[in-house]
């Protein structure tokens, strides 16, 4: 749960920078991405 939930064809709820999208897509594809990495990436 939380802001990083994934949906088909929609990788994230929050606005993400272009550089952040691949990281979120990795998580949506089943990879374990630390939440801190996502926060650091998306809040730049």
UniProtKB/Swiss-Prot annotation:
Disulfide bond entries: 20-41
Gene this chain is encoded by: IHA-B1-2
UniProt keywords, alphabetically: Alpha-amylase inhibitor, Disulfide bond, Secreted
Classification lineage: Eukaryota, Viridiplantae, Streptophyta, Embryophyta, Tracheophyta
Domain of life: Eukaryota
Name this polypeptide is given: Alpha-amylase inhibitor WDAI-3
Gene3D superfamilies: Plant lipid-transfer and hydrophobic proteins
GO MF annotation terms: alpha-amylase inhibitor activity; serine-type endopeptidase inhibitor activity
PTM text: The disulfide bonds are essential for the inhibitor activity.
Localization (cell): Secreted
Annotated source species: Triticum aestivum
């Amino acid at each position: 749960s939380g802001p990083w939930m994934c949906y088909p064809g929609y990788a994230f709820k929050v606005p993400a920078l272009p550089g952040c999208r691949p990281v979120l897509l990795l998580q949506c594809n089943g990879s374990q991405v630390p939440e801190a990495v996502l926060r650091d990436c998306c809040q730049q």
